[in-house]
A protein has these predicted regions:
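Extracellular beta-strand solenoid repeats
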Residues: 50, 57, 63, 74, ...
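Asp-box/WD-like beta-propeller blade repeats and closely related beta-sheet repeat scaffolds
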Residues: 380-381
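Right-handed parallel beta-helix
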Residues: 280-291, 314, 334-348, 357-372, ...
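Short glycine/acidic-rich loop motifs that flank beta-strands on beta-rich extracellular proteins
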Residues: 60-61, 266, 293-299, 325, ...
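Beta-propeller domains
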Residues: 205-215, 224, 251-277, 290-292, ...
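Predominantly extracellular beta-rich ligand-binding scaffolds that present long acidic/polar faces
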Residues: 59-72, 77, 508-651
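Repetitive beta-strand solenoid architecture
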Residues: 4, 45, 52, 58, ...
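Extracellular polysaccharide-degrading/modifying enzymes targeting complex plant/algal/animal polysaccharides
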Residues: 4-5, 9-332, 337, 623, ...
């Protein structure tokens, strides 16, 4: 049992300004406990703060600095809530057209962007009610040119189909929302010219206003339209001029009994050390952190692959919502932890580990209803600045993410080494489950020796974004291993619904003993990279093949051996339209087991590998010709008897032992996949 030099007690109801921190006279609030420790303890003393059940509402973020080190904040109860929300009261009825709305005053010093009713996130008004509008034209954008050739031709102005956009009241509060490529742009309207059907926005899009590879202009919708209020129950609108929230009640809701909460903070917890004096040994256990809002920030471009300007306000970060803040933020913090907590109803990421964050354990938490992603780790791009490493991100449930920023990732690790990312359950997101690395191409970087294992990642994408992976890797990462993960249900928009994605420059990575299935394009894709090892995996039922290759290079791109590859009417290893031909890619492939459950098995094929033409047939290539290239000369074609797990993970995975023995394949043991019970917990 750990002993502490100082022991304090906090209570929201029994505490008072005159409390001394004893169990009989607890302090009132977490800030009071922090300040009492600053005044009382001498250097080197450790402390524990027992926090009684109740609601602790913050008016400003709770901040910690180096002098607050060596402290454990322990929730003594099942419902210790730290909240940044304000409950709106005194609702009145307001008739609007044929509808009766409810109205309540909101804080005048906030631009309210989020509303939660009885603990559920409510949507702002939007147009159209169903589906999406489409950009009519963007000056200077030639759709006949390739999507990547024109990718960075962003704009703040575009033409629309007459009637799609109107001269709305509070026009500058209306936002154009554009999901395309792998991001979602958010562009507040500046002005509308109805005579020319042209709209100009206050921000510029990062990418050209096209629907990436589909050959069409981008889709979009409008959000926060006052004129749409009253059309759908449960929607709401913030009248910024009157500082009022207008809400359309759902059937059965009563003003006297429902609870509506608006966040008044963007962050709840800020743990900020200094580069030469970090916060150390600071721990939080058993809390629920809830209610933060989001804002349109100045977009940072530090991780952009180029062609963007720091002088322009853009509608999105270039990838993965990297500019979004965390409700709980750690910077220059070491040897600390967040354990057995809940983070919910937040506008950005749940947890951010920023520069100089090392040896932090984020374990056994539930992160849900997130505007952004679950955990975002960001270190310095070189070992000399802001190095972050050796963090433990395990046993977390990360669910319902990307509700504001759909390009956010379940667990994002940038410029960081030696991290353990394991036993997490990540699902119901719109973009990648886990993303790691973050140096484009073959440039030097600090990412290495990251272990990604025993994660259950499923039901992500939802057809919203393109170019995603259940596990996404970027850049040279020696020592990084992706193993024993269960990944399935990856659904992209136009292209790139992959279970494992080795993007630009991914090199010296081992992908082994994973079970990957049900991908809207392929189970594995290597854009380009060097000397990766893909072994002893199950890849099954990619809609457009099982493994996609994109770029031919002079070196060996990857080694593919002792894998089970099961398709349903499509070739296994594919390339072609818009990508390299499989014969042109230098790879080592052998001792694999191939089977097609619907058609003659084809080891390789060519054709369109994206999802824009699902009925277009991929052309099988001759197995003899494939083998003549030196590939799969000892591989086997035959029914593997594959059984995949059902929705409750029962009934699999398994393969025929006899078939597996022919190639030396050993079925991955995934019995421990997903979060484990905490020691001492049931």
């Amino acid at each position: 049992m750990t002993t502490f030099d100082i022991e304090l007690y906090v209570s929201p109801g029994d505490g008072s300004a005159g409390g001394d921190g004893s169990s009989e006279r607890p302090l009132a609030g977490l800030e009071a406990a922090r300040d009492e420790l600053r005044a009382r303890r001498t250097p080197g003393q450790s402390a524990v703060v027992h926090v009684a059940a109740g609601h602790y509402r913050l008016e400003t973020p709770l901040t910690f600095e180096p002098s607050d080190s060596a402290t454990t904040y322990l929730a003594d109860g099942h419902d210790v809530r730290v909240e940044g929300g304000l409950v709106l009261r005194y609702w009145t009825e307001v008739p609007v057209g044929d509808a009766v709305l409810w109205a309540a005053d909101a804080p005048a010093d906030r631009h309210i962007r989020s509303l939660f009713v009885d603990g559920e996130r409510r949507a702002r008004t939007r147009r159209p009610r169903e589906g999406l509008f489409r950009v009519a034209h963007q000056d200077g954008l030639d759709l006949m040119r390739g999507s990547h050739e024109t990718q960075y031709q962003g704009s703040d102005t575009f033409g629309f189909t007459p009637g799609d956009i109107e001269a709305y009241d509070a026009l500058r509060d209306v936002e154009v929302v554009v999901p395309h490529y792998w991001i979602q742009e958010r562009l507040p309207i500046a002005e509308v010219d109805l005579a020319t059907s042209t709209v100009r926005c206050a921000r510029r899009s990062v990418f050209a206003l096209r629907d990436d590879i589909s050959g069409s202009f981008a889709n979009y919708y409008l959000e926060n339209v006052r004129e749409a209020l009253g059309e759908v129950a449960g929607e709401w609108y913030y009248d910024r001029a009157a500082h009022r929230v207008l809400y359309v009640p759902r059937p059965g809701e009563r003003r006297e009994t429902f609870t509506a909460t608006v966040p008044v903070l963007d962050e709840l917890l800020l743990v900020h050390g200094e580069e030469d004096r970090p916060v150390t040994d600071l721990h939080f256990e058993g809390f629920t952190f809830a209610y933060t809002d989001w804002s349109l920030q100045r977009r940072t471009l530090s991780d952009s692959p180029g062609r963007l300007s720091d002088e322009i306000a853009y509608g999105s970060a270039p990838q993965a919502a990297t500019d979004v803040t965390g409700a709980l933020e750690f910077r220059h913090t070491t040897d600390s932890s967040l354990v057995n907590c809940v983070v919910e109803h937040v506008g950005g990421h749940a947890v951010s580990l920023e520069a100089g964050s090392s040896r932090i354990a984020v374990t056994h938490n539930t992160l849900r209803d997130l505007g952004g992603g679950g955990i975002a780790v960001t270190g310095g791009a070189s070992e000399a600045t802001g190095l972050s490493r050796d963090n433990v991100l395990t046993d977390n449930e990360i669910v319902t993410g990307g509700r504001v920023f759909p390009a956010a990732v379940g667990i994002l690790v940038r410029h960081s080494a030696g991290n353990t990312i394991s036993h997490n359950h990540i699902h119901d997101l719109h973009y990648s489950g886990i993303s790691c690395g973050w140096t484009w191409g073959y440039r030097d970087g600090v990412a290495r020796d990251n272990v990604i294992e025993y994660n259950h990642i499923h039901d992500i994408g939802h057809g919203t974004m393109s170019d995603m992976g259940g596990v996404y890797l970027l850049g040279v990462q020696p020592g990084t291993v992706v193993r024993r993960n269960l990944i399935h249900g990856i659904q992209c928009a136009n292209y790139g619904g992959w279970c494992v994605y080795l993007d630009e420059g991914s090199s010296h990575i081992v992908v082994e003993e994973n079970v990957c299935f049900d991908a809207s394009t392929q189970c594995l894709h290597q854009h380009y990279g060097r000397e990766n090892t893909i072994r002893n995996n199950v890849f099954a039922f990619g809609a457009r093949g099982l493994i996609a290759v994109t770029r031919a290079e002079e070196h060996v791109s990857f080694t593919l051996e002792r894998n089970v590859l099961v398709s349903a009417g499509v070739p296994a290893i594919v390339g072609g339209t818009g990508a390299a031909h499989p014969y042109d890619v230098r790879l080592i492939s052998d001792l694999n087991l191939f089977w097609d459950t619907r058609a003659d098995t084809a080891m390789s094929g060519e054709g369109r590998v994206d999802a824009t033409a699902p009925d277009e047939v991929l052309t099988p290539l001759s197995d003899d010709a494939w083998r003549a290239q030196g590939h799969d000369r000892h591989s086997v074609i035959g029914d593997v008897g594959l059984v995949l797990p059902g929705p409750d993970r029962a009934g699999g995975p398994s393969v025929s032992r006899e078939r597996a023995a022919e190639i030396g394949f050993v079925m991955p043991d995934l019995t421990g996949v997903g979060p484990r019970s905490r020691p001492g917990k049931q």
